[in-house]
Amino acid sequence: GYSASNGVEEALEARVKPRNLPHSALETMEFQLGLFDGLPADVQRRYLMDVVDGIPDITKELDGMIAAWQRGDAEGLARLMNEDEEEPAMMDALITQRNRTWATWVQSRLDKPGTVFVAVGAGHLAGDGSVQAQLAARGITAHRVQ
């Protein structure tokens, strides 16, 4: 089954900590929770109800998303992730604006010496507003690593 203990953050932390590699997050948990708080109350309620209503299908949906990502099918992943999304304000706040901010950070970081590894959730790597699309708009090419 799916478990937070098997998440990307935990896997990365397990690799960097013993090697004393510097690491940080692009965002804090408080910032992420604040994204919801900044949305209109009716949008928050609809989103909560959509999440609750979708619980019975979550494993099937996650399996489909993981399969699309493993195939390298970013557009298929974007379709699966956004098929139930009826709130443009939600998508803009949770995905597009954050992708734009991260792309700006990456662009700025490329002007500094050293190597940086950036990991973000798969939902940020698919669709028109993806991190890659935001980077491409700045003339930066990103490549998916298997």
Task: Label each PLM-derived region with a short phrase.
Residues 1-111, 130-131:
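Hydrophobic, often amphipathic alpha-helical segments used for membrane interaction and targeting
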